From Swiss-Prot:
The gene is rbfA. GO terms for cellular component: cytosol. PROSITE patterns: RBFA (PS01319). It is found in: Cytoplasm. It comes from the Bacteria. Gene3D superfamilies: 3.30.300.20. This is Ribosome-binding factor A. It comes from Baumannia cicadellinicola subsp. Homalodisca coagulata.
C-alpha cells in the first residue's frame, strides 16, 4: 500500500513553500509582489511540476484576464531563476521544470458564493411577497 503522505506529495509541498518564500524575498519584480502559490502538482518522475498561482487583488473577469496572462508570462520567464533557487535549497537530483498556471478555484468559489447569496435573497423576497415571512 502506498504511503499516505508520499514522497511526491512531500516534494510538491516543499516546492510550494520554497517558491512562496522566493517570491517574497528573492524576486524583485513588482508585478509579482502579490503572488501566492496555492498548490503544486509534481509528475511521477519528479521531472516537471505544475505550479498553481493566485494573484491577490485580481479577480478573473474580462478586464483582468490580460493582466493575469501577463503575470503568468512573467513568472514563466523567471522560472529558470526560481528553479536555480530551488536547486540551492532543496536536495534533489533533478529540479523539476516549472509550469505556472493561474488557479481559478478562488475566483470560481467567489462566483458560486455570489450565486448562492443571490438565490437566498430572491427566495427571501419571494417568501415576503407571498406573506409567508415578515
Amino acid at each position: 500500500m502506498a504511503n499516505v503522505y508520499s514522497r511526491k506529495k512531500r516534494i510538491a509541498h516543499e516546492i510550494q513553500k520554497k517558491i512562496n518564500i522566493s517570491l517574497q524575498h528573492n524576486i524583485r519584480d513588482p508585478r509579482l509582489r502579490k503572488t501566492t502559490i496555492s498548490w503544486v502538482s509534481v509528475s511521477h518522475d519528479l521531472g516537471s511540476a505544475t505550479v498553481f498561482v493566485i494573484f491577490n487583488g485580481i479577480q478573473n473577469d474580462n478586464q483582468t484576464s490580460e493582466e493575469i496572462k501577463k503575470r503568468i508570462k512573467t513568472l514563466q520567464a523567471a522560472s529558470g531563476f526560481i528553479r536555480y533557487l530551488l536547486g540551492k535549497t532543496m536536495h534533489l537530483r533533478i529540479v523539476p521544470k516549472l509550469t505556472f498556471v493561474y488557479d481559478q478555484s478562488l475566483s470560481h468559489g467567489i462566483y458560486i458564493h455570489e450565486l448562492v447569496n443571490k438565490i437566498i435573497r430572491e427566495d427571501h423576497k419571494s417568501l415576503i411577497k407571498n406573506g409567508i415571512v415578515n
